[in-house]
Amino acid sequence: SEHHQESFWTKYVFSQDHKWIGIQYGVTALFFMLFGFALMIVMRYQMVHAGTISPDTYNSFGAMHGTIMVFLGVVPVIVGAYGNYLVPLQIGAPDMAFPKLNMASYWCYFLGGVTMLIGFALPGGAANSGWTSYPPLANIATTGQTVWLLGMLFLIASSLLGSVNIIVTTVQLRVEGLTWMRLPFFVWAQLVTSFLLVLAFPPLQAAGIFQLMDRVVGTSFFMPSGLVVGGEVHAAAGGGSPLLWQHLFWFLAHPEVYVLILPAMGIVAEILANNIRKPLWG
């Protein structure tokens, strides 16, 4: 029987194939990281030749460099690219459990990254309150901070969709005979990482929505009373707690260090075990 010929768009752009989505993640993350690297170079040049960029621009470059490298670079490469490409292959699955969800995960990531970078074209520049987006500065910063928060909501949605997909794929689509104790170490690393993301990202998603409401609607979840800006008391409503944001942010950002390192350790462990021709001990 004749196979249905896929169009260019369905095969390469809106692909549902786990391998191609992994490649999309990797290539897109590489471009984002190159942009983040360029920001770092300009910041270093500013240190040598003071006055090259303004202090506000320097702050924006620092905030966006950190955001790009963590949320648009390393995590999408280590989880999105390697995870999507290798996990189904290592467990004998034909594809991820939810191919359309996988495609949606990538495009949420892409839209989130582009949304954040749009901040550079807005009046006042990109987000400039650090990659941690600490209030109260983040609550009174320029419009770039608003698009940073919108982009972060897309990125969190992407990570949650991808993590659920990896968990379900690993649990349900393992080839017959591949028991838990026979599971490749890299797959274990991706599985644990996915559980960490599913547990840690929702609080930041909620916090991002709250901070967006502080900026756009006029709430004061993180806006303290009596904030003095430019020698005058800020007119925004107070009563909120900047410390609450820090708790919610670091509920994600501390597990994030394990999200960054666990898949990398899984890759190194697989390579070492394969090359020395001995199974992992432990």
List the predicted regions and their residue ranges.
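Membrane-embedded and interfacial regions of multi-pass energy-transducing membrane proteins
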Residues: 1-282
